[in-house]
Amino acid sequence: MRSSDDQPSGGTTVLQRLLQEQLRYGNPSENRSLLAIHQQATGNSSPFSTGSGNQGPQNDVLSSQDHHQQQLVAHPARQEPQGQEIQSENGVMEKQLSPRMQNNEELPTYEEAKVQSQYFRGQQHASVGAAFYVTGVTNQKMRTEGRPSVQRLTPGKMHQDEGLRDLKQGHVRSLSERLMQMSLATSGVKAHPPVTSAPLSPPQPNDLYKNATSSSEFYKAQGPPPSQHSLKGMEHRGPPPEYPFKGVPSQSVVCKSQEPGHFYSEHRLNQPGRTEGQLMRYQHPPEYGAARATQDISSLSLSARNSQPHSPTSSLTAGASSLPLLQSPPSTRLPPGQHLVSNQGDHSAHLSRHQQHLLSSQSHQGDHYRHAQASLTSAQQQPGEAYSAMPRAQQSASYQPMPADPFAMVSRAQQMVEILSDENRNLRQELDGCYEKVARLQKVETEIQRVSEAYENLVKSSSKREALEKAMRNKLEGEIRRMHDFNRDLRDRLETANKQLAEKEYEGSEDTRKTISQLFAKHKENQREKEKLEAELATARSTNEDQRRHIEIRDQALSNAQAKVVKLEEELKKKQVYVDKVEKMQQALVQLQAACEKREQLEHRLRTRLERELESLRIQQRQGNSQPTNASEYNAAALMELLREKEERILALEADMTKWEQKYLEENVMRHFALDAAATVAAQRDTTVISHSPNTSYDTALEARIQKEEEEILMANKRCLDMEGRIKTLHAQIIEKDAMIKVLQQRSRKEPSKTEQLSSMRPAKSLMSISNAGSGLLAHSSTLTGAPIMEEKRDDKSWKGSLGVLLGGDYRVEPVPSTPSPVPPSTPLLSAHSKTGSRDCSTQTERGPESTKTAAVTPISAPMAGPVAAAAPAAAINATAATNTATAATNTTIMVAAAPVAVAAVAAPAAAAATPSPANAAALAAAAAPATSVSAATSVSAANSISPAAPVAPAAVVPPAAPVSPAAAVQIPAAASLTPATVSPTAATATAAVAAATTAAITAAAAAATTAIQVAPATSAPVPSPASIPAPATAQASAPTPTQASTPAPTEPPSPVPTPTPALVQTEGPANPGASSGPRRLSTPNLMCNPDKPDAPAFHSSTLERKTPIQILGQEPDAEMVEYLI
C-alpha cells in the first residue's frame, strides 16, 4: 500500500490546478464541498494522528452535516478533477492507517463507548436500533471448519477494538462517504435518493437486489416472513460497494485475497490481544447484568427512534450498515431454534463494534435500507408474525415491553455476533475491492503525473522553439534586406548596359543598310532565273502527259485482244463439250434402239406363250371336275413351265437393266445440257460485266473465270461421285436379283409337287411393257422416292398395253391344290426414276376340305416425293376365287399393286363340305391418273364358277380422277353359288354381289400413270409388312350379299379403307343354281385410258395404257424382300 511519502511532488501541483479549474468552471453547488475536500487533502490531516476520543463527537457531527449536504445534491457525471480528488482522499486516508496499526493504546470502557454510541446515534434513523435484534443464525460452516463462530471477545479484551477510534475521526468518515459516492458514480450505480420516506415502507418492485427468490422468501410486505431467511437473491447484485481502507484497518498490511470460506482465518492477527478470543466464546456473562444490558439496548433503541427525523444522513448510514446482513450466503445460517448460547458481554461488545461498522459502511446503496428494516423487524417477533406490515407506532410499542430475560439477551447477543461476523466478512470483501480501487487510483495518479511532466516538457520545448523561431526570423529579415540591396545594384547595372547597347546599335545600322541593298539586287536576279525554269518544267510535263495517254491506249488494245482470245477459247471448249454430248447421245440412242428391239421381241414371245397358256387354262376350266388331270403327267409340264418362267424373268430383268441404263444416259445428258446452258449464261453475263467495266483489268476477269471453272469442276466431280454410287447400287441389286433367281430355281426343283399345275393356273406373268401391241399383260409399276423428270413423263405416254388377248376370252380357273404362303411385300423403291417391277403371279391352292381360307396382303407403300410429279396413283386388285370340289378348296388372289400404294388384304373364305360349296368372287380395281396428265387404268375381273352354265361377266369401271388427288375404282364381280342370287350394286356405295359365303376385299390406290396386276396365292398367314409409307389413295369395298342357299357359307368382312372417290361397280349375270360342277366363265372388257384426258376414261377393245413391264413375284417371301432399286 502506498503511503503519503510516496506521492510525487508534481502530483500536488496537478491536483491543485485541476481543483482550481473545477472551482472556476464547474458547478457552483459543488464548489463548497470541493473546497472543503481540497483543504482536508492539503492541510487538515492533523485530526487523523490524534488518538484522544474527546474531539471525535465534534468531527463526527461536522462530517455528518457535510455528508448530508452532499447527499442532497445529485451526483454529477464523473470529471477529471473528481478523479484527482479521490486520489487525494485516499492518500490522506492512507496516512492514518499506518500509525493506527501500531497504536495499541487503551480504548474507553464499555460505559463510555455506550454513551458515545448513543450520542452519535442520536442523529440516526429511529428504526435502526432494531437492526441489533434481528434473529440471526449461527454460521454452522465456520463452526465445522474450526473457525470461531462468535468473533466478539469478553469485556476484558474489548478495549482492543478500534471502532471508537474511527468514531473520533469524523472527517475520515466524511471522506469515506465522498469516496464511496464517487466510486458508485464511476461504476454506473445511481445516486442515493434522499431518505424522506417512512423507514418501514415495504420493498419497492424496482428494488436493486430484488428477484424472484428474495421477493418470494424475504421481501414480502404482508404475511409472516419465514423463520429461515433465504438470501440467495442477494448474490445476484451488481459490483460490490467499494469501501474505504478504514473499514478494517488491521487488515490493510496483509492485503491478501482469500477464498470465500476463509475470511476470518487471519482476522486481525497483528493485534496482540485478539489471539485468545477464540477460547472465550462460551464464558459466562460479565459483571453487567441482563437487566442492564436489556435496559441499555432498550434505551438505545428508543433514542434511535426519537432521533429519526433529524438526520437523514444518519438513516442512510444505518440502512447501509445493515446491508451486510443480507449479503451472507444462505448456507451459513440456521433456523432460530439452533442458536448457540453465548455470554452477555459479547452482546455488549457487539453494540460498540456495530456502531463502528455502521459509521464506516454508511455509503452503501440506499435502496437496501428497506430490506434491512424488513429483515431486522421480522426477527423480534414470532415466526408467524409480519412485522414489516405494522405501522410505526406499533413497532415502537413492540420494543418497549422487552422482557429482561437473560436467556433472551444471550440469544440476542449470539444473534448479533452472527450478524456482525457476516457483516465483517462482507466488509472484508469490500476492503479487498477498495484495495483494487486504490491501486487503480494510484495508477491514474501516476498517469496524471506523467501528463503533467509531459506538459512541462512541452512548455520547455515550446519556449525553446519560440526562441529558435525568433532567431530565425531575425536572420531571415536581415537576409531579405541584403537581397533588396543586391537587387537594387543589379537594376543599376542593367540600365547602364541598356544604354551602351543602344549606342552600339546606332553605329551598326548604316552597315546593315548597305548589306540589304546588295541582297535586294541578288534577289531580283534569282527571280528571273526561277521564271525561266518554271517554263521549261511546264513543257516537260505536257510531253509526259502525251506519252502516258499513248501508253494507256496501247494497254487497252492489248487487253481487248486478250479478252477476245479468252472468249474464243471458252466458246471452243463449249462446242467441244457439245460435240462430246452429241456423241454420247448418239451412243445412247443406238443402245436405246437395240434395247427396244430386244424388248419387243421378248414381249412378243411372252405374249404368244401366255396366250397359249390362257387358252389351255380356259379349256381346263371348261372341262372342270369331269376330267381329272393326271398328276404324274402334269408334273413334268409344270416343271417345264416353271423353267420357262424363270428364263423369262431373267430376260425381263435384263431388259429392265438395259432400259434403266438408257434412262440414266438420257438423264445425264439432259442434266449436262442444263448445267452447260446455265454456265454459258453466267459466263456471258460475267464477260459482259467485265467488258463494260472500265476499272477492271484483265487479271481480275481471268481470276473470276478460273474460280468459276473450279466450281464447275467441283460440281462435276460431285455428280460423278453420285453417279458412281448409283451405279454401284444398281450392280449390287443386280447381283441380289441373280441370287434370288438361283434360290427360286433351287426351290422349284425341290418342290415339284407344289408347282405341277401352276402353268394352267397362271393368268399373267411379269413381262416387259408392250408398245402399242395387240395383246398385253396387266401392268405393274412402282414410282420411286425421287421426283420423275419431265422426260420420264413424256416417255410414259408412249407405252400402251392391252388386256384384250389376256382377258378377251373365257377365263378359266381350275382347282389346283397348293400350300398357302404369305405374299411378300415389295420393298420401298428409293431412286428418282420409275421402274418396272417383277412380281410372281403364281396361284397356289391347298388340298383338303378346309372351311375358310383368308388371303392377307399387306400394303406396299413408298414415299411420294417430288413437287413436279404428282403422287403416283396405282391400282391394287385383289381377287380371290375358290372353287370347291368334293375334296379341295381353292383360293386365288389376283392383285394389281404399285410400290407407293397400299395393297389391301383380301379375305376369301370358302366353305369346305361334301356338297359343292359356293365360289369366291374376284376383286377388280382400277386406278385413275394423277394431275400430271399421265393416267392409267386397269380393270381386271375374275370369277370362279362351279357350274359352266352360270357365267358372271363383271364390267370394269375407271372412275374419273381429280387433277391433284388420285382416284381409285373398285369393281367387285359377282360369283354364283348353288342358289340363285341377283345383286344390283350402286356406284355410290361400291358394293358387290357375292355368292353364299364369299367376301371380297379390294384395295385400290393410285400411282403416277402406272398400274400392274399381281396374282398371288391366297393364304391365311399374315404377311410381314415393310416400313409404312403414306399412300396417295386407297379404296376398299366389301359387301357381303346374302343369297338364297340351302347351306350358306360363313362370311368374313375385311377391314374398311377410306375411298377418296366413289367407285362405280357393275355386276352382270345372275347365278345359275343348277350349275354346280362346270367351270365359270369370266368376260372382262379391255380398258384404255387416254393420257390427254385423265378425267374421262375411254374403253377400247384391245388397248390399255401402261408404262412399265410387270414383275414376277417369287413363290417364297425371300423373293420379294429386295426389288430393283434406283
From Swiss-Prot:
Assembly with partners or alone: Component of a complex whose core is composed of ARHGAP17, AMOT, PALS1, PATJ and PARD3/PAR3. Interacts with MAGI1 and angiostatin. Interacts with YAP1; the interaction facilitates translocation of YAP1 to the cytoplasm and tight junctions. Interacts with WWTR1/TAZ (via WW domain); the interaction facilitates translocation of WWTR1/TAZ to the cytoplasm.
Region (Disordered), start-end ranges: 22-87, 188-252, 302-403, 745-764, 813-855, 1019-1102
Classification of source organism: Eukaryota, Metazoa, Chordata, Craniata, Vertebrata
Expressed in which tissues: Expressed in brain, skeletal muscle and placenta.
InterPro entries assigned: Angiomotin, Angiomotin-like, Angiomotin_C
Taxonomic source organism: Mus musculus
Stretches assigned to coiled coil: 408-668, 700-730
Protein name: Angiomotin
Record's compositionally biased regions (Pro residues): 817-827, 1050-1061
Domain of life of the organism encoding this protein: Eukaryota
Notes on the domains: The angiostatin binding domain (850-1047) allows the binding to angiostatin.
Residue ranges of the motif PDZ-binding: 1123-1126
Regions of compositional bias (Low complexity) in chain numbering: 321-336, 1030-1049
Gene Ontology biological-process annotations: actin cytoskeleton organization; blood vessel endothelial cell migration; blood vessel morphogenesis; cell migration involved in gastrulation; chemotaxis; establishment of cell polarity involved in ameboidal cell migration; gastrulation with mouth forming second; hippo signaling
Residue(s) carrying Phosphoserine: 693
Location of this chain's protein in the cell: Cell junction, Tight junction
GO cellular component: actin filament; bicellular tight junction; COP9 signalosome; cytoplasmic vesicle; endocytic vesicle; external side of plasma membrane; glutamatergic synapse; lamellipodium
Keywords, comma-separated and alphabetical: Cell junction, Coiled coil, Isopeptide bond, Phosphoprotein, Tight junction, Ubl conjugation
Gene encoding the protein: Amot
